[in-house]
Amino acid sequence: QSGNPFSGRTLLVNSDYSSKLDQTRQAFLSRGDQTNAAKVKYVQEKVGTFYWISNIFLLRDIDVAIQNARAAKARGENPIVGLVLYNLPDRDCSAGESSGELKLSQNGLNRYKNEYVNPFAQKLKAASDVQFAVILEPDAIGNMVTGTSAFCRNARGPQQEAIGYAISQLQASHIHLYLDVANGGWLGWADKLEPTAQEVATILQKAGNNAKIRGFSSNVSNYNPYSTSNPPPYTSGSPSPDESRYATNIANAMRQRGLPTQFIIDQSRVALSGARSEWGQWCNVNPAGFGQPFTTNTNNPNVDAIVWVKPGGESDGQCGMGGAPAAGMWFDAYAQMLTQNAHDEIAR
Protein backbone atom coordinates (compact mmCIF):
# COMPACT_ATOMS: atom_id res chain seq x y z
CA GLN A 1 0.00 0.00 0.00
CA SER A 2 2.56 2.55 -1.10
CA GLY A 3 1.61 5.99 -2.38
CA ASN A 4 -1.37 8.17 -1.64
CA PRO A 5 -4.52 6.24 -2.65
CA PHE A 6 -6.44 9.50 -3.13
CA SER A 7 -3.94 10.94 -5.58
CA GLY A 8 -5.55 11.56 -8.99
CA ARG A 9 -8.93 10.32 -7.74
CA THR A 10 -12.14 11.93 -6.54
CA LEU A 11 -14.01 10.86 -3.42
CA LEU A 12 -17.30 9.29 -4.52
CA VAL A 13 -20.49 11.25 -3.83
CA ASN A 14 -22.77 9.53 -1.29
CA SER A 15 -26.08 9.15 -3.15
CA ASP A 16 -28.08 8.56 0.03
CA TYR A 17 -26.75 11.76 1.58
CA SER A 18 -27.40 13.70 -1.62
CA SER A 19 -31.05 12.69 -1.59
CA LYS A 20 -31.44 13.76 2.06
CA LEU A 21 -30.17 17.21 1.07
CA ASP A 22 -33.10 17.65 -1.37
CA GLN A 23 -35.17 18.80 1.62
CA THR A 24 -32.53 21.39 2.52
CA ARG A 25 -32.35 22.74 -1.03
CA GLN A 26 -36.17 22.98 -1.21
CA ALA A 27 -36.24 24.89 2.07
CA PHE A 28 -33.91 27.53 0.61
CA LEU A 29 -35.79 27.66 -2.72
CA SER A 30 -39.12 28.11 -0.93
CA ARG A 31 -37.65 31.22 0.70
CA GLY A 32 -36.24 32.46 -2.60
CA ASP A 33 -32.66 31.93 -1.36
CA GLN A 34 -30.97 30.95 -4.63
CA THR A 35 -27.47 31.44 -3.21
CA ASN A 36 -27.77 28.83 -0.49
CA ALA A 37 -29.83 26.50 -2.71
CA ALA A 38 -26.91 26.55 -5.18
CA LYS A 39 -24.47 25.66 -2.39
CA VAL A 40 -26.59 22.64 -1.44
CA LYS A 41 -26.72 21.54 -5.08
CA TYR A 42 -22.94 21.80 -5.25
CA VAL A 43 -22.59 19.55 -2.19
CA GLN A 44 -25.13 17.09 -3.65
CA GLU A 45 -23.39 16.77 -7.00
CA LYS A 46 -19.73 17.58 -6.44
CA VAL A 47 -18.62 16.82 -2.87
CA GLY A 48 -17.67 13.26 -1.98
CA THR A 49 -18.74 11.90 1.40
CA PHE A 50 -18.09 8.57 3.13
CA TYR A 51 -20.81 5.90 3.38
CA TRP A 52 -21.44 4.73 6.96
CA ILE A 53 -21.93 0.98 7.38
CA SER A 54 -23.00 1.25 11.00
CA ASN A 55 -24.93 -2.00 11.40
CA ILE A 56 -25.40 -5.38 9.71
CA PHE A 57 -28.47 -4.24 7.77
CA LEU A 58 -26.51 -1.40 6.16
CA LEU A 59 -24.02 -3.79 4.54
CA ARG A 60 -26.35 -3.46 1.54
CA ASP A 61 -25.13 0.12 1.12
CA ILE A 62 -21.72 -1.25 0.12
CA ASP A 63 -23.42 -2.70 -2.98
CA VAL A 64 -24.97 0.71 -3.73
CA ALA A 65 -21.59 2.42 -3.37
CA ILE A 66 -19.93 -0.11 -5.68
CA GLN A 67 -22.67 0.39 -8.30
CA ASN A 68 -22.26 4.16 -8.06
CA ALA A 69 -18.47 3.87 -8.38
CA ARG A 70 -18.77 1.71 -11.50
CA ALA A 71 -21.22 4.20 -13.01
CA ALA A 72 -18.77 7.02 -12.27
CA LYS A 73 -15.95 5.05 -13.91
CA ALA A 74 -18.15 4.53 -16.97
CA ARG A 75 -18.53 8.32 -17.19
CA GLY A 76 -14.75 8.66 -17.26
CA GLU A 77 -14.28 9.58 -13.60
CA ASN A 78 -11.69 8.02 -11.30
CA PRO A 79 -13.49 7.52 -7.98
CA ILE A 80 -12.41 6.15 -4.64
CA VAL A 81 -15.20 4.88 -2.38
CA GLY A 82 -15.13 6.03 1.24
CA LEU A 83 -16.62 3.57 3.73
CA VAL A 84 -16.84 3.75 7.53
CA LEU A 85 -16.67 0.37 9.25
CA TYR A 86 -18.54 1.13 12.48
CA ASN A 87 -20.26 -1.64 14.39
CA LEU A 88 -17.88 -2.55 17.20
CA PRO A 89 -19.47 -4.52 20.04
CA ASP A 90 -20.12 -2.18 23.00
CA ARG A 91 -19.10 0.77 20.83
CA ASP A 92 -19.29 4.35 22.11
CA CYS A 93 -18.85 2.99 25.63
CA SER A 94 -18.22 6.48 27.06
CA ALA A 95 -20.84 8.74 25.47
CA GLY A 96 -23.72 6.43 24.69
CA GLU A 97 -25.46 8.56 22.05
CA SER A 98 -24.25 6.16 19.32
CA SER A 99 -24.24 2.78 21.03
CA GLY A 100 -24.66 -0.01 18.49
CA GLU A 101 -26.50 -3.27 17.93
CA LEU A 102 -23.77 -5.65 19.18
CA LYS A 103 -23.10 -6.37 22.85
CA LEU A 104 -20.07 -8.31 24.11
CA SER A 105 -22.34 -9.94 26.71
CA GLN A 106 -24.52 -11.32 23.89
CA ASN A 107 -21.96 -13.03 21.63
CA GLY A 108 -21.11 -9.66 20.08
CA LEU A 109 -17.50 -10.46 19.20
CA ASN A 110 -18.41 -13.55 17.16
CA ARG A 111 -21.33 -11.79 15.53
CA TYR A 112 -19.08 -8.86 14.62
CA LYS A 113 -16.61 -11.19 12.91
CA ASN A 114 -19.08 -13.51 11.17
CA GLU A 115 -22.14 -11.39 10.42
CA TYR A 116 -20.49 -8.01 9.87
CA VAL A 117 -16.76 -8.02 9.07
CA ASN A 118 -16.75 -11.17 6.91
CA PRO A 119 -19.51 -10.02 4.50
CA PHE A 120 -18.03 -6.49 4.51
CA ALA A 121 -14.66 -7.91 3.43
CA GLN A 122 -16.18 -10.30 0.88
CA LYS A 123 -18.05 -7.49 -0.88
CA LEU A 124 -14.90 -5.35 -1.14
CA LYS A 125 -12.65 -8.19 -2.25
CA ALA A 126 -15.13 -9.17 -4.97
CA ALA A 127 -15.05 -5.60 -6.36
CA SER A 128 -11.36 -5.53 -7.20
CA ASP A 129 -12.04 -3.01 -10.00
CA VAL A 130 -12.98 -0.36 -7.39
CA GLN A 131 -10.69 1.54 -5.00
CA PHE A 132 -11.81 1.74 -1.37
CA ALA A 133 -10.74 3.88 1.59
CA VAL A 134 -12.06 2.34 4.80
CA ILE A 135 -12.11 4.12 8.16
CA LEU A 136 -12.06 1.63 11.00
CA GLU A 137 -14.22 2.16 14.10
CA PRO A 138 -14.38 5.89 14.87
CA ASP A 139 -13.75 6.77 18.54
CA ALA A 140 -12.79 3.23 19.57
CA ILE A 141 -9.13 4.06 20.25
CA GLY A 142 -10.16 7.27 22.00
CA ASN A 143 -12.24 5.20 24.41
CA MET A 144 -9.42 2.65 24.83
CA VAL A 145 -6.93 5.35 25.79
CA THR A 146 -9.14 7.48 28.06
CA GLY A 147 -12.18 5.33 28.96
CA THR A 148 -12.08 4.90 32.73
CA SER A 149 -15.48 3.27 33.33
CA ALA A 150 -15.57 -0.46 34.06
CA PHE A 151 -17.71 -0.83 30.93
CA CYS A 152 -15.01 0.70 28.70
CA ARG A 153 -12.18 -1.14 30.47
CA ASN A 154 -13.89 -4.51 30.08
CA ALA A 155 -14.55 -3.84 26.40
CA ARG A 156 -10.96 -2.93 25.60
CA GLY A 157 -9.37 -6.36 25.02
CA PRO A 158 -12.21 -7.81 22.93
CA GLN A 159 -12.44 -4.56 20.94
CA GLN A 160 -8.70 -4.67 20.17
CA GLU A 161 -9.21 -8.22 18.92
CA ALA A 162 -12.25 -7.17 16.89
CA ILE A 163 -10.49 -4.31 15.11
CA GLY A 164 -7.40 -6.46 14.55
CA TYR A 165 -9.66 -9.06 12.93
CA ALA A 166 -11.23 -6.45 10.63
CA ILE A 167 -7.77 -5.27 9.54
CA SER A 168 -6.68 -8.86 8.86
CA GLN A 169 -9.72 -9.54 6.66
CA LEU A 170 -9.40 -6.35 4.59
CA GLN A 171 -5.89 -6.91 3.24
CA ALA A 172 -6.00 -6.22 -0.52
CA SER A 173 -4.19 -3.83 -2.84
CA HIS A 174 -7.41 -1.94 -3.73
CA ILE A 175 -8.44 -1.50 -0.07
CA HIS A 176 -6.77 1.31 1.88
CA LEU A 177 -7.27 1.20 5.65
CA TYR A 178 -7.33 4.15 8.02
CA LEU A 179 -7.59 3.33 11.72
CA ASP A 180 -9.45 6.06 13.57
CA VAL A 181 -7.55 7.97 16.29
CA ALA A 182 -10.33 10.30 17.51
CA ASN A 183 -9.24 13.96 17.29
CA GLY A 184 -6.73 16.44 18.62
CA GLY A 185 -8.99 17.56 21.45
CA TRP A 186 -9.23 13.99 22.73
CA LEU A 187 -5.82 12.38 22.08
CA GLY A 188 -3.63 15.29 20.97
CA TRP A 189 -2.39 16.21 24.44
CA ALA A 190 1.30 15.54 25.12
CA ASP A 191 0.54 12.74 27.60
CA LYS A 192 -1.90 10.98 25.23
CA LEU A 193 0.29 10.65 22.10
CA GLU A 194 2.38 7.73 23.36
CA PRO A 195 -0.58 5.73 24.78
CA THR A 196 -2.35 6.20 21.43
CA ALA A 197 0.64 4.79 19.53
CA GLN A 198 0.77 1.90 22.01
CA GLU A 199 -2.92 1.11 21.41
CA VAL A 200 -2.36 1.11 17.63
CA ALA A 201 0.66 -1.18 18.01
CA THR A 202 -1.41 -3.63 20.07
CA ILE A 203 -4.23 -3.69 17.51
CA LEU A 204 -1.83 -4.25 14.61
CA GLN A 205 -0.15 -7.02 16.57
CA LYS A 206 -3.56 -8.66 16.98
CA ALA A 207 -4.17 -8.31 13.22
CA GLY A 208 -1.09 -10.51 12.75
CA ASN A 209 0.56 -11.81 9.58
CA ASN A 210 2.23 -8.50 8.72
CA ALA A 211 -1.19 -6.91 8.22
CA LYS A 212 -0.87 -3.38 6.83
CA ILE A 213 -2.85 -0.19 7.20
CA ARG A 214 -2.30 2.99 5.20
CA GLY A 215 -2.69 5.21 8.24
CA PHE A 216 -5.22 6.97 10.43
CA SER A 217 -8.35 9.09 10.36
CA SER A 218 -9.05 11.98 12.69
CA ASN A 219 -11.78 14.49 13.51
CA VAL A 220 -14.47 12.07 12.29
CA SER A 221 -17.86 13.60 13.21
CA ASN A 222 -16.05 16.32 15.15
CA TYR A 223 -15.66 20.04 14.49
CA ASN A 224 -11.97 20.90 14.79
CA PRO A 225 -10.37 23.10 12.12
CA TYR A 226 -7.74 21.62 9.81
CA SER A 227 -5.36 24.46 10.53
CA THR A 228 -5.74 27.69 12.43
CA SER A 229 -3.47 30.57 13.34
CA ASN A 230 -5.93 31.67 16.02
CA PRO A 231 -6.70 28.65 18.22
CA PRO A 232 -9.56 28.92 20.73
CA PRO A 233 -8.60 29.40 24.42
CA TYR A 234 -9.60 25.85 25.37
CA THR A 235 -6.69 24.46 23.30
CA SER A 236 -4.20 26.24 25.56
CA GLY A 237 -1.41 23.90 26.64
CA SER A 238 -2.07 21.38 23.86
CA PRO A 239 0.53 20.75 21.13
CA SER A 240 -2.40 19.87 18.82
CA PRO A 241 -4.64 22.97 18.56
CA ASP A 242 -5.70 21.97 15.03
CA GLU A 243 -5.97 18.67 13.17
CA SER A 244 -2.97 19.21 10.89
CA ARG A 245 -0.73 19.64 13.93
CA TYR A 246 -2.43 16.67 15.59
CA ALA A 247 -1.57 14.53 12.55
CA THR A 248 2.06 15.65 12.70
CA ASN A 249 2.29 14.86 16.43
CA ILE A 250 0.70 11.42 16.12
CA ALA A 251 2.85 10.68 13.05
CA ASN A 252 5.97 11.41 15.10
CA ALA A 253 4.82 9.07 17.87
CA MET A 254 4.03 6.35 15.31
CA ARG A 255 7.31 6.79 13.41
CA GLN A 256 9.28 5.96 16.57
CA ARG A 257 7.57 2.55 16.60
CA GLY A 258 7.92 1.92 12.86
CA LEU A 259 4.17 2.37 12.40
CA PRO A 260 2.39 4.16 9.52
CA THR A 261 2.30 7.96 9.54
CA GLN A 262 -0.39 8.98 7.01
CA PHE A 263 -3.74 10.62 7.75
CA ILE A 264 -7.12 11.55 6.36
CA ILE A 265 -8.98 14.29 8.21
CA ASP A 266 -12.73 14.95 8.33
CA GLN A 267 -13.70 18.54 7.54
CA SER A 268 -17.39 17.99 6.78
CA ARG A 269 -18.32 20.29 9.67
CA VAL A 270 -16.14 22.94 11.30
CA ALA A 271 -17.09 24.98 14.38
CA LEU A 272 -17.19 28.72 13.86
CA SER A 273 -15.05 30.92 16.07
CA GLY A 274 -16.59 31.14 19.54
CA ALA A 275 -19.05 28.29 18.97
CA ARG A 276 -17.59 26.13 21.74
CA SER A 277 -16.68 27.07 25.30
CA GLU A 278 -14.80 23.80 25.78
CA TRP A 279 -13.13 21.29 23.47
CA GLY A 280 -15.23 18.40 24.72
CA GLN A 281 -18.38 19.81 23.08
CA TRP A 282 -19.01 17.40 20.19
CA CYS A 283 -22.79 17.40 19.74
CA ASN A 284 -24.55 19.47 17.03
CA VAL A 285 -22.17 22.36 17.68
CA ASN A 286 -23.77 25.71 16.86
CA PRO A 287 -22.74 27.64 14.83
CA ALA A 288 -20.75 25.49 12.40
CA GLY A 289 -20.31 25.32 8.64
CA PHE A 290 -19.47 22.84 5.92
CA GLY A 291 -15.66 22.70 5.79
CA GLN A 292 -13.07 22.29 3.04
CA PRO A 293 -14.34 19.73 0.49
CA PHE A 294 -12.20 16.77 -0.63
CA THR A 295 -8.66 17.67 -1.63
CA THR A 296 -5.20 16.14 -1.65
CA ASN A 297 -3.64 19.62 -1.40
CA THR A 298 -3.10 19.39 2.34
CA ASN A 299 0.18 21.29 2.94
CA ASN A 300 1.21 18.46 5.27
CA PRO A 301 3.26 15.47 4.05
CA ASN A 302 1.53 13.28 6.66
CA VAL A 303 -1.98 14.05 5.38
CA ASP A 304 -3.15 12.10 2.31
CA ALA A 305 -6.41 14.01 1.99
CA ILE A 306 -8.99 16.24 3.58
CA VAL A 307 -12.29 14.37 3.31
CA TRP A 308 -15.94 14.57 4.35
CA VAL A 309 -16.78 11.61 6.58
CA LYS A 310 -19.81 12.66 8.63
CA PRO A 311 -22.80 13.58 6.43
CA GLY A 312 -23.47 17.10 7.71
CA GLY A 313 -27.16 17.36 8.62
CA GLU A 314 -27.36 13.97 10.31
CA SER A 315 -27.77 14.63 14.04
CA ASP A 316 -25.08 13.74 16.58
CA GLY A 317 -27.74 13.03 19.21
CA GLN A 318 -30.36 14.83 21.28
CA CYS A 319 -27.93 17.50 22.45
CA GLY A 320 -26.28 20.69 21.24
CA MET A 321 -28.43 22.88 18.98
CA GLY A 322 -32.08 23.12 20.05
CA GLY A 323 -34.54 20.68 18.49
CA ALA A 324 -31.93 18.02 17.70
CA PRO A 325 -33.34 14.54 16.97
CA ALA A 326 -31.70 11.22 17.92
CA ALA A 327 -28.24 10.37 16.55
CA GLY A 328 -28.28 9.69 12.80
CA MET A 329 -31.71 11.25 12.21
CA TRP A 330 -31.96 14.10 9.70
CA PHE A 331 -31.80 17.58 11.25
CA ASP A 332 -32.67 19.97 8.43
CA ALA A 333 -32.28 23.19 10.42
CA TYR A 334 -28.73 22.08 11.11
CA ALA A 335 -28.03 21.29 7.44
CA GLN A 336 -29.31 24.76 6.54
CA MET A 337 -26.96 26.36 9.06
CA LEU A 338 -23.99 24.38 7.72
CA THR A 339 -24.86 25.63 4.24
CA GLN A 340 -25.15 29.27 5.28
CA ASN A 341 -21.71 29.06 6.93
CA ALA A 342 -20.10 26.92 4.21
CA HIS A 343 -16.45 27.02 3.18
CA ASP A 344 -15.68 29.45 0.33
CA GLU A 345 -14.96 26.60 -2.09
CA ILE A 346 -18.62 25.55 -2.01
CA ALA A 347 -20.31 27.37 -4.89
CA ARG A 348 -21.41 30.86 -4.09
Swiss-Prot record:
This is Endoglucanase-6B. Keywords: Carbohydrate metabolism, Cellulose degradation, Glycosidase, Hydrolase, Polysaccharide degradation. Belongs to the glycosyl hydrolase 6 (cellulase B) family. The active site is at residues 92, 139. It comes from the Eukaryota. The gene is cel6B. PROSITE patterns: GLYCOSYL_HYDROL_F6_2. Monomer. Residues 222-244 are annotated as: Disordered. Substrate binds at residues 52, 54, 183, 186, 222, 282, 310, 314. Its EC number is 3.2.1.4. Pfam families: Glyco_hydro_6. It comes from Humicola insolens (Soft-rot fungus).
